Regions:
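C-terminal motif of bacterial Sec signal peptides marking the signal peptidase cleavage site
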Residues: 22-25
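Bacterial signal peptide processing site
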Residues: 27-29
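A cross-family detector of function-defining hotspots
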Residues: 33-35, 63-104, 125, 130-176, ...
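Second-shell loop/turn segments in exported
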Residues: 52-58, 117-124
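Bacterial N-terminal signal peptides that target proteins for export
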Residues: 2-13
Length: 195
């Protein structure tokens, strides 16, 4: 089938209408699921996921796991270790599955990012070069050798959040960011997570 430009434009227009309708319907379901139109429409949407030292979207460092679960943001692991363990995004929360939230004594203390789909507020992400981090963060970036892998690095951003006891820690393979985490000190620096 050969399609002229006018037909292609018309097809593209209808495709956009369908996508917009689905997106609108999904947002409506989010409002229903959360039980509050203001919560879903507050402008703090989880679909535009960015991370900073304070958390991601509605999930903030210092928030209790109970609050995050009751708001439909995180799942509770029934066999969770009360001292330190991880919780993960609830289905329908709008958060990528590749985020992990460290819970220490019932409170969220850090978010671990293992997906390139999530950036920091400054635009840094997995796959970025060490030079890009240096460009973004400048003098705020502190470099140190990786605990287990020679040639790899931790690149830590304290910046203004240092007075609040929070940081972002990027792990690199000596060239590119392989993962990062953000949250409260000292937990954000724990290399083994809860291990």
């Amino acid at each position: 089938m050969v399609m002229n430009r006018a037909a292609a434009k018309l097809l593209g227009f209808w495709a956009m209408i369908v996508v917009a309708s689905v997106a609108y319907a999904c947002k409506g379901n989010e409002q229903i699921r959360n039980g509050s139109a203001t919560k879903a429409g507050s402008g703090d949407t989880l679909s535009s996921t960015t991370v900073n030292e304070d958390g991601v979207g509605q999930i903030q460092v210092g928030m209790t796991l109970d609050d995050a679960v009751s708001q439909g943001l995180l799942n509770r692991n029934p066999s969770m270790n009360s001292e330190c363990d991880y919780a993960y995004p609830a289905v329908g929360s709008g958060l990528p599955d590749d985020l992990g939230f460290m819970i220490v004594k019932g409170k969220i203390v850090r978010v671990d990012v293992d997906t390139g789909a999530v950036t920091t507020d400054d635009g840094a992400k997995i796959g970025d070069s060490e030079d890009r981090l240096r460009t973004i963060y400048g003098d705020e970036l502190q470099e140190s050798p990786h605990k287990y892998n020679p040639g790899w690095h931790y690149m830590t951003v304290m910046g203004d959040s240092a007075s609040q006891g929070k940081a972002i820690v990027f792990e690199t393979d000596g060239k590119k960011v392989t993962r990062y985490r953000a949250g409260q000190l000292p937990q954000v620096q724990w290399v083994e997570g809860c291990g």
